[in-house]
């Protein structure tokens, strides 16, 4: 079993990809929502760390970033944003060093 996250959620051919993988390799992929992704991230972190007080978990991926506010009892709030490292890089369309304008672009996309 596999899980598809932001790249497959946003792909025009995501369902076709899932079908092709299953037919050719035999692996069933489930495309999960950003909310489900945040839940799984929390479970993974919780499995590794037994935090007794409030915690903020951040997962920066290629196509999305999840923020999870949690405490010892569970998730208090979770948000998934379509801002990931690969997505920002593609929007910048750069192969060399970033300029001051590139950093402005990144700030606008992250903070607005």
Named regions from a protein language model:
Residues 1-57, 68-112:
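Nucleotide/phosphate-binding catalytic cleft detector across ATP-hydrolyzing
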Residues 64:
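Active-site-adjacent helix-turn-beta-strand microarchitecture at beta-sheet edges
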């Amino acid at each position: 079993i596999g899980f598809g996250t932001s790249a497959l959620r946003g792909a025009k051919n995501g369902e076709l990809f899932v079908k092709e993988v299953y037919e050719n390799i035999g692996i069933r992929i489930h495309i999960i929502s950003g909310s489900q992704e945040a839940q799984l991230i929390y479970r993974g972190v919780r499995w590794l760390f037994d935090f007794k007080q409030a915690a903020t978990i951040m997962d920066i991926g290629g196509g999305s970033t999840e923020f999870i506010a949690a405490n010892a009892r569970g998730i208090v709030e979770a948000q998934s944003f379509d801002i990931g490292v690969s997505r920002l890089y593609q929007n910048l369309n750069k192969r060399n060093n970033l300029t001051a304008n590139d950093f402005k672009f990144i700030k606008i996309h992250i903070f607005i």
